[in-house]
A protein has these predicted regions:
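Extracellular/periplasmic carbohydrate-active domains that bind, remodel
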Residues: 1-439
Length: 439
């Protein structure tokens, strides 16, 4: 169906815009090249199916990019995708149909003809994605790099790796989306060096979304299966909302609200490549069956950035009205900078965390390694010596009305702090009893 799809786009372009309509049925193809002022509409019952490459045909080759050393292959190329656009404006993809990346892959993505993303957009503006579904999307369901004025509304994603990667984008609205991504992050904001220059991801709202780590395909078909216990990084399922890891640029003015996490990792805010992460507000979050730290804030020094880039900053963060049930206690919540680079001005309030518990007083004597240059995940620290929050290399942290519950007794202290100043605890309870912060 590739030739017919190309003709449809050419006709729309010749008329200075219009709608390319996919009626009910399957349309197997390789790369679809978007154009400005085009509305791609996928009707109910229509499926755009990514074909498997053959010896003579395949997806568009990855374009040259001299700035690949600071991020992986997937973040550095856009054309090797099922649907892609570069330097475009006024684009809409909508409709109740399905984009099925059947022939896409995360593996062997450097080979000629191989496609590794469902939708890729670079340096575009005024883009709307709404109402369709994405299944089995290779490395990314959506990679949007340097896209300004991006709206993603009521999109369902069920894939094996990342769902939405929002990289170096400005003015982004993500709402009423369902993203299942057991082997990678569901909704992730990034600020890579893929464009060849520093650019922040800023002015982003994520609201009324559901993210999870159920088995691939089992959310779209509503079977909610749990038979794939481990992601490729050996960290169990993923499926979370995250800022980072790519963070050469920064993250500014981000609001996340009214979201549900289920059978996945917890909320992660990470800047480890020199970016500034600041002015973040997160509220009304509920989590269930969380496999690592419910709240993970990390300022590190991996430094996948041009030489001379200084360590980043993390400050002015508000997290409130969070409920977490059945969280793995090995990795309690973590707020950790590094020596000489402190996380600052964080307030956590109106939080309930229900942990599994079961660890010992001896576990409370452990000292986690610094791991300044390591890829940030909670398990890089080993078992956490605190059963509530581990707080290190910070300044001006407030915990107010934070309530902890434990299914099994846990002998570790509730809070462990190191190189921490101006820490305030207010209205803290453990299993319904007031916690004396003087102890």
């Amino acid at each position: 169906d590739c030739a017919a799809i190309i003709r449809a786009f050419e006709d729309a372009v010749s008329q200075c815009g219009g709608t390319v309509f996919f009626p009910a049925g399957d349309f197997a193809c390789y790369s679809i090249r978007l154009a400005s002022h085009i509305h791609l509409y996928i009707e109910q019952g229509a499926r755009i199916v990514g074909a498997f490459p053959s010896a003579t045909e395949g997806y568009d080759p990855a374009e040259p990019n001299e700035h690949t050393r600071f991020q992986d292959f997937g973040h550095s190329h856009w054309k090797n995708s099922l649907i892609w656009g570069i330097g475009l404006e006024d684009i809409t993809i909508s409709g109740p149909g399905l984009i099925y990346g059947k022939g896409l892959t995360r593996e062997e993505s450097r080979l000629p003809g191989v496609g590794n993303k469902a939708i890729s957009l670079k340096l575009c503006k005024n883009v709307t994605l709404k109402d369709f579904s994405l299944l089995q999307c290779g490395h990314f369901g959506l990679l949007a790099t340097g896209v300004d004025n991006l709206s993603i509304l009521n999109v369902k994603v069920d894939t094996n790796r990342d769902g939405f990667d929002i990289d170096c984008c400005k003015n982004v609205r993500i709402s009423h989306c369902t993203v299942n991504a057991p082997w990678d992050d569901a909704i992730v904001l990034k600020a890579s060096y893929g464009l060849g220059y520093f650019k922040d991801t800023e002015n982003v709202t994520i609201s009324d979304c559901f993210v999870s780590g159920y088995d691939r395909g089992s959310v779209l078909d509503c079977t909610w299966q749990r038979d794939e216990p481990q992601a490729p990084d050996h960290g169990f399922v993923t499926g979370r909302i995250k800022l980072g890891t790519e963070s050469s640029g920064g993250f500014k003015n981000i609001a996340i609200t009214n979201c549900i996490f289920e059978r996945c990792r917890g909320l992660a805010l990470e800047t480890v490549d020199g970016g500034k992460l600041e002015d973040i507000v997160i509220s009304n979050i509920t989590m269930r069956d969380i496999v690592n730290a419910p709240i993970f804030l990390r300022l590190g020094a991996r430094m996948r950035s041009p030489q001379g880039t200084p360590v980043g900053t993390m400050k002015r963060i508000l997290i409130s009205h969070v409920n977490v049930f059945n969280a793995d206690s090995r990795y309690s919540s973590i707020i950790s900078g590094i020596p000489g680079a402190l996380i600052e001005d964080v307030t956590l309030s109106d939080i309930h965390i229900y942990h599994q518990g079961g660890y010992t007083e001896a576990d409370g004597l452990l000292t986690p390694p610094e791991q300044e240059k390591v890829y940030p995940e909670p398990w890089m620290f080993g078992t956490i010596p605190a059963k509530g929050f581990y707080i290190r290399h910070v300044r001006n942290i407030t915990l107010d009305n934070v309530n902890f519950h434990y299914e099994k007794a846990d002998g570790r202290p509730l809070f462990v702090t190191d190189d921490a100043s101006d820490i305030r605890y207010r209205n803290i309870t453990v299993d319904g009893k007031e916690f004396n912060t003087a102890n």
